[in-house]
Regions:
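Active-site neighborhoods and metal-handling regions in enzymes and metal-associated proteins
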Residues: 1-616
Length: 616
């Protein structure tokens, strides 16, 4: 058992799907429903990113357990006619190697996507390309968002597909998916940790809704099933799913009246949210929810089409059939720009995490005389280092990778059979939650060097130094306040390209209550702005399949420059030193050396240096 923190789910029984059996069972459902194909996602009814295997139909039908990726399951007749396996899996560049490793090519065809196409675009294009063999296609209305469905319908219009909504968990039942049940309490975090009361959050929400719709008070309803929306608005936490401090449920707000609906699976959770008396908790009883909502004379319904499932929207339409629906969720923007109280909690959390990571990477580098260490040991070591600093949960399964495994961008196997090998790259990507429930995240790489005569190979020094240069470029550049996330990505990525390398993922993701947060993003073409007081990663990487990979990830606060209000700068809140055995000083310019000298000096002061810096 790797994760032994307070809110881990390590005690749950493992779920190891038999892909042969699940595919046979779903094939029978398709035949009975006269469907040629069905979409299979890795989302739950809350459109959650990280799902446990037991609630992930995509894993059950393919064997692939990465956090992102969807698929199309074909009936036996359709698969035979097309000459392909029954499951077509679509994955982005982070998971090409992992999908190859985990999937049986006789049962799963892997569609490897590049940077310029999304999973949902690729699935739609595949359906159109094979439309002559497809007539009726199903989708799980509880596991697909409104925006995903709308784009899918629009992009496949030319194929004239007959779409069938499956809203009663038909796929889950057919493949005997265990699902997810949690009974953990939903509790408040103090206002001192968030900087805003629940009443202030709801006032801000209603102000933005009124500005968007122009409707009088009480005529606009808002709802969301995004668990970090709930946690933000209600100053609440629950740790209801692995690697997330938030809690499950659907939230409905009309003016000052708020309903927290707990559907099957979380309906037994105790709720102790006492600071907002107008909160109504409704458990499992859909009729009771409809009775609560029906008296409101709602003319507008606002929600994020990207983050609300189709079945929930269909239920809302039954309550307010004449209301106009708007794709508007202001909570994402409200969450992105953090209060000073929240930023203080982030700084504290990253100070603790930085100390844990530096301690663990020193251990990973030098080892212990005469002791064999494995990837599993490394994952355990960072878990225990976090625990020693009062962490309560991991923010994602720690990526502890040795040698060639470090070339898997999201490798999570952490094998007890893979030894940390002398002279190989060792990568650790990890994060933790502390009492306030805000996520941390950081990646560092070291050269395993238990003997003084071990030296880095030229290719190892090259990719490490180039990735470091790219990261520094993102950290120190002053950007105009009008810049977009795509501009930051392009600048960082170009450093790698100038040296003949690139990486198949974005440069940065928002960080908040969840380790991946919307509202800000550094990725090719990203149109999110550089939101002041947002927290976001800067994490270029270089991956050489079969050899090894490097990713250097720091987390920054976007700050408006007081002296130049039209300029933003980045405050790095990670202080974990670098491995100077892997840095080619000849590749560094004077500015990069000066930056690293100051950074390593700070790490020395805080006790978070990993190796001795020759510049000091």
């Amino acid at each position: 058992m790797i994760d032994r923190l307070k809110y881990s789910f390590s005690g749950l029984p493992p779920y190891d799907a038999s892909v042969v059996d699940t595919q046979a069972a779903l094939s029978r459902l398709l035949d009975a429903a006269r469907l040629d194909a069905v979409l299979v996602t890795s989302q739950d009814e809350y459109v959650t990113e990280y799902l446990p295997r037991s609630n992930n139909p995509r894993y059950a039908l393919s064997g692939f357990d990465g956090s992102a990726g969807c698929g199309i399951f074909l009936s036996a007749a359709t698969a035979q006619a097309l000459g392909v396996p029954p499951f077509v899996l679509f994955v982005d560049g982070r998971y090409h190697l992992q999908a190859e490793q985990q999937c049986d090519p006789a049962r799963v065809r892997i569609e490897k996507l590049g940077m310029n196409v999304t999973i949902w675009q690729a699935m739609a294009d595949w359906l159109v390309a094979h439309g002559s063999r497809l007539a009726r296609v199903g989708y799980d209305a509880r596991r697909i968002s409104v925006a995903q469905r709308d784009r899918l319908f629009e992009r496949t219009r030319a194929a004239s597909l007959d779409w069938t909504s499956l809203a009663e968990r038909e796929i889950d039942l057919a493949i005997a998916l265990p699902g997810w049940v949690v009974e953990r309490p939903i509790f408040e975090v103090p206002e001192a940790m968030t900087g805003l009361s629940v009443a202030q959050n709801l006032d801000a929400l209603n102000t933005r809704l009124a500005a968007h719709t122009g409707a009088p008070d009480g005529r606009t309803a808002f709802f969301t099933c995004a668990s970090d929306d709930l946690a933000y608005l209600l100053n609440s936490r629950g740790y209801h799913i692995p690697n997330a401090s938030s809690h499950l449920g659907f939230l409905f707000a009309v003016g000052g009246q708020v309903a927290l609906f707990l559907p099957e699976g979380c309906d037994r959770c105790e709720v102790t949210l006492e600071s907002y008396p107008a909160l109504h908790v409704i458990r499992r009883d859909v009729a009771a929810l409809e009775r609560f909502l029906a008296p409101f004379a709602v003319e507008h319904v606002c929600y994020g089409f990207e983050s609300v499932n189709c079945a929930l929207v269909d239920a809302v339409k039954r309550v307010w059939p004449q209301a106009r629906h708007a794709d508007f969720n202001p909570v994402e923007a409200m969450r992105a720009g953090k209060t000073s109280a929240v930023l203080d909690r982030f700084r504290d959390a990253f100070a603790r995490s930085s100390a844990a990571i530096a301690e663990t990477m020193r251990w990973a580098k030098t080892g212990e005389p005469g002791v064999r260490h494995t990837e599993y040991d490394l994952a355990r070591a960072i878990n225990d280092a976090y625990a020693a600093r009062s962490a309560v949960a991991l923010t994602f399964p720690s990526i502890a990778a040795n040698g060639a495994n470090s070339a898997f961008a999201h490798y999570t196997a952490a094998s007890a059979d893979v030894e940390l090998t002398e002279g190989e790259l060792v990568l650790l990507d990890s994060g933790a939650y502390y009492e306030a429930g805000f996520a941390t995240d950081c990646t560092r790489v070291v050269l395993r060097r238990t003997h003084p005569d071990t030296v880095a190979q030229p290719w190892q020094r090259e990719i490490y130094t180039v990735a470091l240069k790219a990261c520094i470029k993102g950290l120190v550049t002053r950007f105009p306040s009008t810049a977009k996330g795509g501009d930051v990505d392009a600048l960082v990525r170009q450093v790698c390209r100038d040296h003949g390398h690139d990486f198949g993922h974005g440069t940065g993701h928002g960080v908040g209550i969840h380790v991946h947060e919307g509202g800000v993003r550094f990725a090719p073409g990203a149109q999110y702005g550089l939101v002041p007081n947002a927290v976001i990663s800067v994490e270029p990487g270089i991956y050489l399949p079969g050899k090894g990979g490097v990713r250097i990830e720091n987390i920054v606060i976007i700050r408006q420059d007081d002296a130049q209000p039209d300029t933003v700068t980045f405050e790095n809140i990670v202080t974990v030193g670098y491995d100077w055995d892997l840095i080619d000083l000849d590749l560094l310019d004077d500015d990069e050396r000066a930056y690293l000298r100051d950074y390593e000096r700070l790490c020395v002061e805080r006790g978070t240096q990993v190796t001795a810096c020759p510049l000091l």
